[in-house]
Amino acid sequence: MSFSPSIAGLSGPLSALSDALTTLHESAFARLGSVFLTRLPAAPLSAPYLVGFSAETAALLGLEPGLENDPGFAELFSGNLTREWPAEALPYASVYSGHQFGVWAGQLGDGRALGLGEVEHNGQRFELQLKGAGRTPYSRMGDGRAVLRSSIREYLCSEAMHHLGIPTTRALCVIGSDQPVRRETVETAAVVTRVAPSFVRFGHFEHFYSNDRTDALRALADHVIERFYPHCREADDPYLALLNEAVISTADLMVDWQAVGFCHGVMNTDNMSIVGLTIDYGPFGFMDGFDAGYICNHSDSQGRYAYKMQPQIAYWNLFCLAQGLLPLLGEKHEESVRGDKAIEDAQRVLGGFKNRFAPALERRMRAKLGLEIEREGDDGLVNRLFEVMHANRADFTLTFRNLARVSKHDASGDAPVRDLFLDRAAFDAWVNDYRARLSEETRDDAARAIAMNRVNPKFVLRNHLAETAIRRAKEKDFSEVERLAAILRRPFDEQPEHEAYAGLPPDWASSLEVSCSS
């Protein structure tokens, strides 16, 4: 079903936008039917205006540069125009369930997000979703709105993560408004247009499992297999193969997160993507000083989702997904043993998480240290570095970036990284072992530094950088949002003109707190 008739009413300067969006059509997920979703228009957003726009993401959708300047662009991506769409083309909120902070929360769902549809361009399909579009049947006690600060953070982090090479949802734009929204204080509303191949979560499978809807569970699994893992159809047990794909993509994602010091903050099962994307940017954080127990979410008082816990939590979440898939597993076995065999098969596949994650993280850490040749003792060298970093709260990003300056011959390049450690003697003891290890490498210092700088970013979205952009945006100055976005699109480049964005956080940054309140 094409949505083009519903937006063809756009006229004047917006006709180009209407033409560009003629490929917007009903998503394959929406075609699964009403048991999966509820259709409704977005809530009105008063006097919407553009805050941020990603030309890169627009290009994925086939949107030409300049369309964001059309007078009605903000009207469309605020959701305001959806009130004129026919009933069969209305946006939709999907229903799911899940475990939150380790506790079964029952039915959840898109409480403030609405799917617009799907765009196909250059052989790729992307779903569009408006986050902050108003109340839905799944909002529970929420108002369905997102606020400007959290919307800017999601926009910036979506783009930053993509350019770090980490699978993620993307962000097309942020639309702001002066419409008040009450949180701890009164803030203003905003809408982020998210873009992703799929927004299906572990929690979708948990929902239909918990409601004993095996028919819907099968339809959902078939949808994911058809769209993303068609090779699973050739397996002896296609649904077990789907679980295996989730194990692989989730393990790989955890390697990516841990390697850059990223902490998600709310790794509930309803915030886990079935296709291995980073999804639902809330109280996330890139750590500054290294702390293995770093907690980015002020609401996480027990540290369930601390940095060091993320791989373990990912495995736990996969266990919940496996449980949700159990009714579909083991169909190749005799009925009398099917249940037991399904559990055995699921446990075996889940065991692959550690086998995937641990070696991949070891390889990544060797790359971050510039160790091309694997040697016995490399793991110990990495672990001792983290111990010294933890004891000194040495900056995560700057430590790894500046290690590229260390020479295998002498201490002439040590200062930039050595100065990050209060206990210089402890660092010297480690770096001398590191230098000895580098002497076993065949690459020269220059070649090694180039390779290290390709995996150790100079620029990440530190909280204080986001906060500065947010404060200016609240004053209607959006230049810092776009400046920061541009810098984060080149995280591995030197960009000497932006050196201030790569430095240690200012003292005031230590007082910043992020929580689930957005």
Curated annotation (Swiss-Prot):
Needed cofactors: Mg(2+); Mn(2+)
Residues involved in ATP binding: G109, G111, R112, K131, D143, G144, R194, R201, D280
Catalytic activity: L-seryl-[protein] + ATP = 3-O-(5'-adenylyl)-L-seryl-[protein] + diphosphate; L-threonyl-[protein] + ATP = 3-O-(5'-adenylyl)-L-threonyl-[protein] + diphosphate; L-tyrosyl-[protein] + ATP = O-(5'-adenylyl)-L-tyrosyl-[protein] + diphosphate; L-histidyl-[protein] + UTP = N(tele)-(5'-uridylyl)-L-histidyl-[protein] + diphosphate
Region annotated Disordered, chain positions: 498-518
EC number: 2.7.7.-, 2.7.7.108
Recorded GO MF terms: AMPylase activity; ATP binding; magnesium ion binding
Domain of life from the UniProt record: Bacteria
Binding site for Mg(2+): N271, D280
Active site: D270
Pfam families in UniProt: SelO
Keywords: ATP-binding, Magnesium, Manganese, Metal-binding, Nucleotide-binding, Nucleotidyltransferase, Transferase
InterPro entries cross-referenced by the UniProt entry: SelO (IPR003846)
Family: Belongs to the SELO family.
Task performed by this protein: Nucleotidyltransferase involved in the post-translational modification of proteins. It can catalyze the addition of adenosine monophosphate (AMP) or uridine monophosphate (UMP) to a protein, resulting in modifications known as AMPylation and UMPylation.
Name of protein: Protein nucleotidyltransferase YdiU
